[in-house]
């Protein structure tokens, strides 16, 4: 078996570097097509989240290749410039890492639940784009299954340690904040709006299209069209942006000319909010790195021992499958 992975994550690079390696669904197909032109690469899966971008490859036995070089090529960056910001894993270290990743124990917020869906979505998208092979399919399925077992056996996370609740904690620590604007009606945006409403904040959420059936609107939320977001800034105390846009949703040149709130929270990668905004008078800007700073779980060491015990069983199952498949090929 020759599986290799390489990637960049929050432990290796700050958000301004990580966001350069984020891929949209529309760009992934081209990346996969280029990767699979190499006849020695049988399958590829890219896991791209707000905190990491990782490339998993199933290759010809004996082939040595650094997937991070391929990621740099796909993102049109010089590998040498970022060569000290990535990690490379091979063999059993790959599946162990993937299992731990799916369990949430490699996340900035220990044990968070969103990553298991992101891992599942990564393999599903690779399959849809004809990029995965049986080795990666089984490896990702094993990782997701092991994560489900960990989640049902151990209590690793609580709602208070999710990204939205971490943002809420920041908002609650500030005085005189009652009106919030959430930019983005995706999963994180809706969750953020719902949590704000539950905690008594007057909350407005942006919609790209205001037609019945096109958007899910959190109960109790007010709505405005996305194009009206700058005008709405005049009437809010905090703005939270959580979109998948490749461009800034808020630019300093447009904000500087209007009355603006003093608290901005950016939950996106690539970042939604122009980082220059923090240079404005009396403004605080939080991005994912600053939101997660200081998140500590005192029980991690003991919990990690239990997680590894569960994962080991699934890693054994994977290798048993692989050896069985290899014998079938030889007979």
UniProtKB/Swiss-Prot annotation:
- Keyword Cytoplasm assigned to the entry: answer is no
- BP GO annotations: protoporphyrinogen IX biosynthetic process from glutamate
Q: Where does substrate bind?
A: 49-52, 107, 112-114, 118
Q: In which pathway does it act?
A: Porphyrin-containing compound metabolism; protoporphyrin-IX biosynthesis; 5-aminolevulinate from L-glutamyl-tRNA(Glu): step 1/2
Sorted UniProt keywords: NADP, Oxidoreductase, Porphyrin biosynthesis
Cited NCBIfam families:
hemA (TIGR01035)
Q: What else is known?
A: During catalysis, the active site Cys acts as a nucleophile attacking the alpha-carbonyl group of tRNA-bound glutamate with the formation of a thioester intermediate between enzyme and glutamate, and the concomitant release of tRNA(Glu). The thioester intermediate is finally reduced by direct hydride transfer from NADPH, to form the product GSA.
Q: How does it assemble?
A: Homodimer.
Name of the featured protein = Glutamyl-tRNA reductase
Lineage summary? Bacteria, Bacillati, Bacillota, Clostridia, Eubacteriales
Q: Which gene encodes it?
A: hemA
